[in-house]
Amino acid sequence: MASNSIKIFAGNSHPELAEKVARRIGLSLGKVAVVQYSNRETSVTIGESVRDEDVFILQTGCGSINDHLMELLIMINACRSASARRITAIIPCFPYARQDKKDKSRAPITARLVANMLQTAGCNHIITMDLHASQIQGFFNVPVDNLYAEPSVLRYIRENIDTTVNPTVIVSPDAGGAKRATALADRLDLDFALIHKERQKANEVSRMVLVGDVRDKLAILVDDMADTCGTLGLAAKTLKDNGAKAVYAIVTHGILSGKAIKVINESALEKVIVTNTIPHDDKRSLCSKIETIDISGVLAECIRRIHHGESVSVLFSVAPA
């Protein structure tokens, strides 16, 4: 058993999630003061000793992403300078995860740059969830635990949707998410369908083609990320046009930027279920279709297991209560 104690600090991106995680472990959040000067520089002061402690810093990729990323880097570096034994960054929604490859001439691989910056700042370990591209783990020279929302999603479906009464089909909104959707369908013993989408430019889908049978069924769209929700809106229309009785969407990272709320409200989607890797309270007040799955239990159990040197692989298949 580790002799050093756990210290959990929260950045400004998602203090509510950090508070839930700390409460589940039976701790209070560590004292930290983050100040932004009039010239937009960020200053961080760690308000308690972290010498020889096991430090966890929670900061997710949302809102003012660049400010939050810099804040995280400074917090990590401050803890390293204060002689923390180990520093783990908990980044539920990893920033710049969609910039993971050189997909056109002179394009930067920004996800790798973020990985390098985190390590240079002094990070010893990364916890994240449903990376948009799993190969991002290879950008790090420190351990990365990429947790899955799937166990929590399975629990939500089993507790809230009676698939024996309502014939249900799991749908991937694109070919890239087929593996995720088929894994979920297999564990629930449900049918699977796929939507092929053609893009003319980023965030805009021009045409969708359905592969599979959704007629008279509840169709559940499953994806790792929903940004402007253009894909989900068009996918829901495609499913309804092909006879689906109702359409839900379950998404790990509900970024919901731009006109996303307007798109959801005007779409054929009856529910959009997102995890709380990103805060949604302001969005939920504008859209009654949005529901939230709490993943604080997964993060808390991961922290406990890492601190005590236990395996975290059980969290890939079971969601803590």
Swiss-Prot record:
Domain of life: Eukaryota
Gene3D superfamilies for this protein: 3.40.50.2020
Keywords (A to Z) from UniProt: ATP-binding, Cytoplasm, Kinase, Magnesium, Metal-binding, Nucleotide biosynthesis, Nucleotide-binding, Phosphoprotein, Transferase
InterPro entries in UniProt: PRib_PP_synth_CS, Pribosyltran_N, PRibTrfase_dom, PRTase-like, Rib-P_diPkinase
EC numbers: 2.7.6.1
Residues bearing PTM Phosphoserine: 172
GO biological process assignments: 5-phosphoribose 1-diphosphate biosynthetic process; purine nucleotide biosynthetic process; ribonucleoside monophosphate biosynthetic process
Pathway note: Metabolic intermediate biosynthesis; 5-phospho-alpha-D-ribose 1-diphosphate biosynthesis; 5-phospho-alpha-D-ribose 1-diphosphate from D-ribose 5-phosphate (route I): step 1/1
Positions that bind Mg(2+): 130, 132, 145
Primary residence: cytoplasm
A GO term, aspect molecular function: ribose phosphate diphosphokinase activity
Location of the protein in the cell: Cytoplasm
GO cellular component entries: cytoplasm; cytosol; ribose phosphate diphosphokinase complex
PROSITE patterns for this protein: PRPP_SYNTHASE (PS00114)
Catalysed reactions, as listed in the record: D-ribose 5-phosphate + ATP = 5-phospho-alpha-D-ribose 1-diphosphate + AMP + H(+)
Family: Belongs to the ribose-phosphate pyrophosphokinase family.
Function of the protein: 5-phosphoribose 1-diphosphate synthase involved in nucleotide, histidine, and tryptophan biosynthesis. Active in heteromultimeric complexes with other 5-phosphoribose 1-diphosphate synthases.
Stated name of the protein: Ribose-phosphate pyrophosphokinase 2
Lineage, broadest ranks: Eukaryota, Fungi, Dikarya, Ascomycota, Taphrinomycotina
